Every structure is written in C-alpha cells, then in structure tokens.
Amino acid sequence: MPPTLKVVIAGDGNVGKTSLIRRWCEGKFEVSRVMTIGVDFQTKVVSLPDGPVKLSIWDVAGQDRFRSLRSGFYRGSRAVALVYDVTESASLANLARWREEINKTVPHGKYVVVGNKIDLPRTVSVEAAHRFAEGTGASYVETSAATGEGVPEMFEAIARLASHTTR
C-alpha cells in the first residue's frame, strides 16, 4: 500500500481548482460547475521514481466567506498548489495572501504555482507568473482543465514535492 500524502489545492474562487482535480482524477471537464462549499477531496495514486504515492487532494473553497474554516484544512498538508487564472490578473496578485494564510498553519510550506485556463486569451504574462513563483521559491506550471494540457505535470510536480517533504 503506497503512503498517503495530503496536498492542498488553493486559490481564488473560479480559478478552476475543482476542474483541475476532476480532469486528473476522473478524466472529465464540466463547463458549468457548482461552487465548492468549505472543502472537498479526492484521492489518486501517482507513480514516482521512488515508488507510488497516494495523494489525498484537498480542494479548498476560494470564496472569502470560507476563510475562517480553511486553516483547519491546511493542517498536515505536505505540499500546496496555488492556482490562479491566467485571464484574471487579480487572481495571481491574491496568491501572496493565500500563501501568507497557509503559512500561518503550515510554516515552511512547499508550493507549486499553477497558471490555469491557458486555453483562453491571457492577461497575465508568463514572465509575471514566473517572477511570483521564483520570489516564493515555488516551481511553476501552466494548465488547462478544459483541454487537459499540463494537468498530469501539475499533479506529478505536487506529488514529487509532497514525497520529499518531511513532517
């Protein structure tokens, strides 16, 4: 039985967190989606060079009204994907706040910055996203939940990060 590693997918509402998880875990993409209330989670086994790991993927609601609930959801996480929407510059700017919020519960957290919705016309440059990721010591990947582009790479990156984090 592979070890289970808790990872968190965080970011503003409507950036596509749930869609990324469903694309990877279920191979589905739904154009209209119901908002996540509080938290949802799924699991999936990932094969890594050191052996398989089972990711327990926590999908955290992005709306501010759930902020008071979120700190409990971060506890015990091995890695975090900070997701923003490449068509919405505020969602990238808000990742600094997300990181600060998570670091209160998970000091020295390990992060992957994810630019989602690359199938749509972007307003956030790749360079700006790279600067943010580098400034926080995070790796950077781009994805499209709609087409599936980059989604396996995103989850492999977070699995590698989680498997090399000791708690």
What are these regions (language model features)?
Residues M1-R167:
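TRAFAC-class small GTPase G-domain
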